[in-house]
Amino acid sequence: MSLQIQMIGTGSAFAKKFYNNNALVKCNGFQLLIDCGVTAPRALHELGVPITGIDGILITHIHADHVGGIEEFAFRLKYKYGMTIKLFVPAALVNPLWDHSLRGGLENKAEGLEQLADYFDVVALEEAVVHEIHPGLTVELVRSQHIAGKASYSLLLNNLLFYSSDARFNYAQLVELSTSGRCKYILHDCQLAEPAAVHATLNELLTLPEAVQEMIMLMHYDDEMEQFIGKSGKMSFMQQHKTYSFTEAT
């Protein structure tokens, strides 16, 4: 089974040129948006993708560059189109997403809008379980280290592709993924500047064996990315708006 992924944004939280790091996954006619940051609605508009063409949104954690566009989705879907789409949320984040990120803008007691489920078909996902999002598309949540004390997740898609979302460098995990057969491709966030903070840095990723680097495509980078082309070892930088096809064949 193949997957297509179009990066509607490839930038870090503060990138202005490359937009927030959000991905549109296409599989068997289903379009899943991985994260919906502040720039997501504009990015989709520029690509000519209507929000009514999005079948579901999957959230990896609750920073604004990953959830800041959900309010616009909620209002437009409800009041302009009168429709509901699936919102896939890690079970540990369902309440925090509403209480700490969306409630201030979306709650409207006068209209009986008091919870996330009043806007979306909310599907809570447990970690370390393979979930079928759509026939032919599975997702497994992998707990990641990003911000201490805050739940954050990477994703395994179809046991084919590892999508880090936001994660600190984990040498052992990346080597294990590459040698265990759990995936064939790795899309990893990459902080270009030092020192390391809450993302893997390019220098850290360059310590990986070349065989692992060859599996990695870099995303969630700073606006200065072009200065680092040719300096990323065997790894390549993903391009904003480009559609990539990932197949089981090597």
From Swiss-Prot:
Ranges where the record places region Beta-lactamase-like: 19-220
InterPro entries: Anti-Pycsar_Apyc1, Metallo-B-lactamas, RibonucZ/Hydroxyglut_hydro
Key words of the record: Hydrolase, Metal-binding, Zinc
Binding site for Zn(2+) 1: 65-66, 166, 220
Pfam families per UniProt: Anti-Pycsar_Apyc1 (PF23023)
Reaction catalysis annotation: 3',5'-cyclic CMP + H2O = CMP + H(+); 3',5'-cyclic UMP + H2O = UMP + H(+)
SMART domains named among the record's database cross-references: Lactamase_B
Signal peptide stretch: none
Assembly and binders: Homodimer.
Note: This homolog of an antiviral immune evasion nuclease may be due to cryptic prophages, or it may play a role in regulating the endogenous antiviral defense system based on cyclic nucleotides.
Protein name per its UniProtKB record: Anti-Pycsar protein Apyc1
Source taxonomy: Bacteria, Bacillati, Bacillota, Bacilli, Bacillales
